[in-house]
């Protein structure tokens, strides 16, 4: 009897061990499954990117397209939230604050006012800008080489653009240059200041007119007729968004219109030293990819100048003004 009880106890003990082992094995597989699920979720994270664009016009639109293209080519899963401020700084601020409240992973700010609004809204969320002329002057970065904060991006003014443009105006025989810009845009003020400095060195004078809104552009341009021998429109968002008004005045009065970027040449400007806005948007997108992947930090990512500066001349406009394009200019002709 004792022997039977002993055998039964041993059998029961063995059964308990077997069940414990099976239970442990089941728990281990469950853990592995959960871990795999978590790992899969991390690998398939969808990033949220808020896009704040100051105003709707071809150059800024091209930059946004370039940014999206770089993101799409990276293979990252991304949800874009595109917003346009329509040139309204108060709306710019609202857009930036909404992005912060919704917890986006990154903000893409297209143009100086949008970048400034985003930088004021957050010191934590990475901000990548483009179409900014003077990032240091706008207090977006400490320096081009070492931004120092949560903000970096691409510039829309090559260091040689203004000097080459002024030299080209002189080559055309122009002595008095009319400039229309929004005095409330920091990037425009910085450019006009530089143009005045370089123009004086070449013996040219600058006649100015300010336009606070796109509706003011035509009247401001007309006020310079009789004072200027040519117009030079820089990368001012307010004026470029209403460029057709400037083109109309220039054409009516047979005055050369030099513009600040290539998209405006296609719209009817005579010429520009410039680059493709799509390209600087694309380069900004490449920065964003590295930051989202944890491969870089905005504070340590140098802001970049545009590459491939070239002179493009609208052949149709040149012909209408009786301007002979010289081979020595090394210009690329836009045939329309």
What are these regions (language model features)?
Residues 45-59, 174-182, 231-232:
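Short beta-strand segments enriched in small/hydrophobic residues
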Residues 1-28:
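Sec-dependent N-terminal signal peptides of Gram-positive bacterial secreted proteins and lipoproteins
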Residues 135-176, 276-296:
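Hydrophobic alpha-helical segments within soluble ligand-binding/sensing domains
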Residues 49, 67, 152-202, 302-317:
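An alpha-beta-alpha
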Residues 293-336:
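Hinge/cleft segment of the Venus flytrap/periplasmic-binding protein
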Residues 84-142, 236-251:
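Beta-alpha junction/loop-to-helix N-cap segments that form part of ligand/metal-binding clefts
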Residues 79-101, 210-224:
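Structural motif
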Residues 22-43:
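Bacterial lipoprotein signal-peptidase II cleavage site
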């Amino acid at each position: 009897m004792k022997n039977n009880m002993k055998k039964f106890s041993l059998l029961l003990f063995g059964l308990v061990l077997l069940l414990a082992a099976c239970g442990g094995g089941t728990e281990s597989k469950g853990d592995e499954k959960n871990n795999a699920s978590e790992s899969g979720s991390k690998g398939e994270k969808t990033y949220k990117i808020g896009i704040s664009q100051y105003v709707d016009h071809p150059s800024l639109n091209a930059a946004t397209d370039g940014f999206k293209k770089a993101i799409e080519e990276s293979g990252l899963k991304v949800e874009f939230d595109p917003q346009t401020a329509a040139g309204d700084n108060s709306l710019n601020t609202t857009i930036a604050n909404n992005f912060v409240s919704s917890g986006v992973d990154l903000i893409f700010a297209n143009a100086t006012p949008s970048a400034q609004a985003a930088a004021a809204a957050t010191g934590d969320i990475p901000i990548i800008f483009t179409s900014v002329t003077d990032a240091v002057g706008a207090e977006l970065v400490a320096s081009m080489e070492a931004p120092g904060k949560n903000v970096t991006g691409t510039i829309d003014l090559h260091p040689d653009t203004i000097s080459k443009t002024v030299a080209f105006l002189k080559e055309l025989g122009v002595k008095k240059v009319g400039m229309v810009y929004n005095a409330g845009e920091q990037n425009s003020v910085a450019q006009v200041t530089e143009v005045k400095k370089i123009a004086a060195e070449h013996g040219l004078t600058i006649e100015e007119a300010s336009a606070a809104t796109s509706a003011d552009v035509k009247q401001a341009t007309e006020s310079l007729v009789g004072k200027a021998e040519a117009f030079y429109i820089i990368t001012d968002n307010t004026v470029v968004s209403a460029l057709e008004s400037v083109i109309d005045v220039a054409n009516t009065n047979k005055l050369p219109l030099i513009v600040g970027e290539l998209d405006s040449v296609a719209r009817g400007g005579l010429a520009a030293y410039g680059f493709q806005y799509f390209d600087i948007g694309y380069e900004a997108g490449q920065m964003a990819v590295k930051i989202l992947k944890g491969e870089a930090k905005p504070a340590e990512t140098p802001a970049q100048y545009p590459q491939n500066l070239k002179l493009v001349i609208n052949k149709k406009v040149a012909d209408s003004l009786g301007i002979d394009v010289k081979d020595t200019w090394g210009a690329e002709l836009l045939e329309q």
